[in-house]
Amino acid sequence: MLYKGDTLYLDWLEDGIAELVFDAPGSVNKLDTATVASLGEAIGVLEQQSDLKGLLLRSNKAAFIVGADITEFLSLFLVPEEQLSQWLHFANSVFNRLEDLPVPTIAAVNGYALGGGCECVLATDYRLATPDLRIGLPETKLGIMPGFGGSVRMPRMLGADSALEIIAAGKDVGADQALKIGLVDGVVKAEKLVEGAMAILRQAINGDLDWKAKRQPKLEPLKLSKIEAAMSFTIAKGMVAQTAGKHYPAPITAVKTIEAAARFGREEALNLENKSFVPLAHTNEARALVGIFLNDQYVKGKAKKLTKDVETPKQAAVLGAGIMGGGIAYQSAWKGVPVVMKDINDKSLTLGMTEAAKLLNKQLERGKIDGLKLAGVISTIHPTLDYAGFDRVDVVVEAVVENPKVKKAVLAETEQKVRPDTVLASNTSTIPISELANALERPENFCGMHFFNPVHRMPLVEIIRGEKSSDETIAKVVAWASKMGKTPIVVNDCPGFFVNRVLFPYFAGFSQLLRDGADFRKIDKVMEKQFGWPMGPAYLLDVVGIDTAHHAQAVMAAGFPQRMQKDYRDAIDALFNANRFGQKNGLGFWRYKEDSKGKPKKEEDVVVDDLLAKVSQPKRDFSEEEIIARMMIPMVNEVVRCLEEGIIATPAEADMALVYGLGFPPFHGGAFRWLDTLGSAKYLDMAQQYQHLGPLYEVPEGLRNKARHNEPYYPPVEPARPVGDLKTA
């Protein structure tokens, strides 16, 4: 043994060839600060070996290196800029020394090589991969950019276009694509990986492969003519501006850095990468996006822990076909859980099957599946007008009309047709689960399972625990949701549960702004362009359906009369009474016509201004700041109340539900992350300016207490140790 660290070791293989093996104590390898330091020590040992002829890098895990240790990021991002810059210089000196070894090097890459893992193998001369490879640089999705030389080496290896596509989008590629663009030099079966890598290494040692020529381009300026450079970087900047926008500075910073570094060799190019990385790491956007990643891991870990002792449902059923039922059936079948889809109407069954077939055909068109796979999936969806096969299902989700009487009748009837241990769930969006449970003989086997539309795209499923829902019931539906590829978040029961309960105060803020003379077009523009929502409130209401919102608004008002009962006719009432239901009938805040792709395209409709004039004061202008405050305060206050009342368990789960269920702008990180960034004291000062608008603007007492001491909702993070300590961590 030449060297043994906590996460890697170095040993001789044969005849002057050494192997450096990443083998962390846990289930995966991460390129954390300790591993970077250990890698530097191992390379120091190699540099002393006069008889060294070649080096093989490999992993003892199912994945090579999954990336940097993101749990360290928030503390690293608090380190002063100068210290963070020094540590990056140290880390890059390690990879430079690996790249500068006087012998050929190869990485045998299996599974994931992401972020720092990818940057590590870019420093070797050759890369051989297994078919399950996923390799790439996802850093821009975390609000930063590659910091271990990825933005320097990848463009010089692949050319600017391929590298920009990966780096700016934060994407990863599979083995075939990696081979095609030159990111790896070959792909072999897993059992042949080390053998194949050794064969390449021997060829390089013997002079059959010119490893020095392979290495040289990574040390030099990027080989691009002025015209090629202008085309590549202009196109890349245009694409980034279109897709990322101003709220996500990392992608455009990465592109500009690669452009600026193109005319320099490795050392100066790395300095430019360092100078760009450090300011990004100190942005609110980076902290928010890293926070989302960590919250996502927390939520998924919680679901995994919850389901460790239950069997995932093997057969499911959906009550009520149509678009929603068809979407749920498709998602279940697509992920391998056969499903019975029941409706009392043959026309609805046809609609549900058509929806599933449409989604599968899209996968076929994109080349994700072949005809055989399509036929196989669709054959596991069984449409029926009766209860045939219900005696074999493990879980049933009801997705009929949003009417408590109808839902109770359907659930009670279904309970008599299934096994005593079958779990029933309702896809209701607002009706309390404990109320629906009153119709059942086995309420302990019942809970809520709130999917979001469109089901195949929206990652969140709210799992609602009723007063009598058993732990096993909750665990079974969480297991099914996870199997479907969704992110399940368990909430406690109340009208609207969590997501809709906090959404309708937001809509109330919108209605009050309109009542006071604001223009809905400006509100939408501000909330989309300035705050960052994917849709403004008017457009969102048109997509949700004005009739749906009108009904849900009444349910929420009955559930929370002190805050959500209004004493005036609002814009939703006005449009509903005019039979303007949004996209579903082509008339809402806008008029809708199908474009060439069959998608609804919004157009101005002057009739709307006349309708709204009847329920609002004369038009007046509001500042962007006032619009944002009046829209967000009711939502944030209600989010805080949900935490204080135990409807949602943690700030992390609340923020993920908002991001995954409502499209809360990820660069804000969710309501609690936004609150922490703003500061609870500053938020209280802002909210107090609008308390005259009513109970929705009154700040909850718990938040007032935090504001007195300016306390955050997320646990404070301590800065990482000084750079000198980090080097030897």
Curated annotation (Swiss-Prot):
Region described as Disordered? 708-729
Question: What does the sequence similarity comment in the record state about its family?
Answer: In the N-terminal section; belongs to the enoyl-CoA hydratase/isomerase family. In the C-terminal section; belongs to the 3-hydroxyacyl-CoA dehydrogenase family.
What functional role does this protein have? Involved in the aerobic and anaerobic degradation of long-chain fatty acids via beta-oxidation cycle. Catalyzes the formation of 3-oxoacyl-CoA from enoyl-CoA via L-3-hydroxyacyl-CoA. It can also use D-3-hydroxyacyl-CoA and cis-3-enoyl-CoA as substrate.
Recorded hits in SUPFAM superfamilies, A to Z, give: 6-phosphogluconate dehydrogenase C-terminal domain-like, ClpP/crotonase, NAD(P)-binding Rossmann-fold domains
Q: Where is this region: 3-hydroxyacyl-CoA dehydrogenase?
A: 311-729
Q: In which pathway does it act?
A: Lipid metabolism; fatty acid beta-oxidation
Tell me the active site: 450 (for 3-hydroxyacyl-coa dehydrogenase activity)
- At which positions is substrate bound? 296, 500, 660
Of the GO CC terms on this record, one is:
fatty acid beta-oxidation multienzyme complex
Gene, per the UniProt record: fadB
Known catalysed reaction(s)?
a (3S)-3-hydroxyacyl-CoA + NAD(+) = a 3-oxoacyl-CoA + NADH + H(+); a (3S)-3-hydroxyacyl-CoA = a (2E)-enoyl-CoA + H2O; a 4-saturated-(3S)-3-hydroxyacyl-CoA = a (3E)-enoyl-CoA + H2O; (3S)-3-hydroxybutanoyl-CoA = (3R)-3-hydroxybutanoyl-CoA
Q: Which NCBIfam families match?
A: FadB, PRK11730.1
Q: Does the keyword Isomerase apply?
A: yes
Keywords, alphabetical: Fatty acid metabolism, Isomerase, Lipid degradation, Lipid metabolism, Lyase, Multifunctional enzyme, NAD, Oxidoreductase
**In its keyword annotation, does this UniProt entry include NAD?**
yes
Against InterPro entries, the record matches this protein to: 3-OHacyl-CoA_DH_CS (IPR006180), 3-OHacyl-CoA_DH_NAD-bd (IPR006176), 3HC_DH_C (IPR006108), 6-PGluconate_DH-like_C_sf (IPR008927), ClpP/crotonase-like_dom_sf (IPR029045), Enoyl-CoA_hyd/isom_CS (IPR018376), Enoyl-CoA_hydra/iso (IPR001753), FA_oxidation_alpha_subunit (IPR050136)
Q: What Gene Ontology molecular function terms does this protein carry?
A: 3-hydroxybutyryl-CoA epimerase activity; delta(3)-delta(2)-enoyl-CoA isomerase activity; enoyl-CoA hydratase activity; long-chain-3-hydroxyacyl-CoA dehydrogenase activity; NAD+ binding
The chain's coiled-coil residues are none
Q: What is this protein identified as?
A: Fatty acid oxidation complex subunit alpha
Quick one: a GO biological-process term for this protein? fatty acid beta-oxidation
Enzyme nomenclature, EC number: 4.2.1.17, 5.1.2.3, 5.3.3.8, 1.1.1.35
Q: Name one Pfam family in it.
A: 3HCDH
Which residues are involved in binding NAD(+)?
Answer: 324, 343, 400-402, 407, 429, 453
Annotated stretches, region: Enoyl-CoA hydratase/isomerase: 1-189
Q: Site (Important for catalytic activity): give the residues.
A: 119, 139
